[in-house]
Amino acid sequence: DAGYDMLNCDNGTYDAWYWAHPPGYMPENCNLEDVEHIKKFVDIPVVCAGRMTPQEGASAVKENKIDAVGFARQFLTDPAWVTKLMEDREEDIKPCICCHNACFNMAHYEGVPNIQDMDDTSNMSRCALNPMTMQSKKYKIVPARVSKSVAVIGGGIGGMETALVAAARGHAVTLYEKTDRLGGIFIEAAAPSFKEKDRNLIEWYRRAINNSSVTVKLNSEIKR
């Protein structure tokens, strides 16, 4: 009666803002049950958002529990994720870990540092895992003028990202890790049961390294 065409629903409020964009410690599909209930009382399309998984979302739409699913942060991490899903390449999707470290760049609070003060990031949402998000014209991986032999010391997330970018530019890269596996301190950080996306990210990087030209040396501590 009010003239709304659609309801895009979540449980977020000014006092519980995180329900609108659940962080990593909240369950996946945590808004779905309540949004399904809303659909029973309206005759316009109802959309559910908030850490929705494609599988659960598709099932809910198929069963007419909701009309559509809302996704946002995953597009910032991997803009091609829907294409990869359609091509049955889900393992190639770089996962959003729901960290809020860059996508909430636009959420400014007095007294809190924020890169909105920088001209090239003002009014732009970013991604901690994808520096090219909203900055594709500024950050590009271009072939190196001279191919070099590059040693990357440390096989954590930062080391693996560095190795992948250097290899993509045409350098011969060797990645040295003193332990028997890649992941670094992020392995411990991803240990809590609710951090499944963090563990998925480690596996994504390991797979990306394995599929690249990077040479990996495990159990290889580099000393001065």
Feature locations, PLM:
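Short hydrophobic/charged patches on amphipathic alpha-helices used for structural packing
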Residues: G57-A58, R206, R224
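Flavin-dependent oxidoreductase catalytic cores
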Residues: D1-I153, I157-V173, R181
